[in-house]
Curated annotation (Swiss-Prot):
It comes from the Eukaryota. This is Cytochrome c oxidase subunit 8B, mitochondrial. Component of the cytochrome c oxidase, the last enzyme in the mitochondrial electron transport chain which drives oxidative phosphorylation. The respiratory chain contains 3 multisubunit complexes succinate dehydrogenase (complex II, CII), ubiquinol-cytochrome c oxidoreductase (cytochrome b-c1 complex, complex III, CIII) and cytochrome c oxidase (complex IV, CIV), that cooperate to transfer electrons derived from NADH and succinate to molecular oxygen, creating an electrochemical gradient over the inner membrane that drives transmembrane transport and the ATP synthase. Pfam families: COX8. One of its GO terms (biological process) is response to xenobiotic stimulus. The keyword Coiled coil does not apply.
């Protein structure tokens, strides 16, 4: 097994010299600005997406307790 460390060094060599490309991040303003109505609709959909399932679970909490105890 004395040949294992040189083989491992050969496998690790390409890792040292890999070139990682820069991320292409642009900070330009939006091409079409978002209206207040679009923002309101988006926020209400996000809030409803979180609150409706949570409310459903909380309203059925007693039935969950009964079914797990049986």
């Amino acid at each position: 097994m004395p040949r294992l460390p040189p083989i491992l060094r050969l496998l690790q060599a390409p890792e040292k010299y890999t070139v990682i490309p820069k991320a292409r991040i642009s900070s330009k303003p939006a091409k079409s600005p978002t209206s207040a109505m679009d923002q309101a609709v988006g926020m209400s959909v996000i809030i409803a997406g979180f609150m409706v399932p949570a409310g459903w679970v909380l309203s059925h909490l007693e039935s969950y307790k009964r079914s797990s105890a049986a």
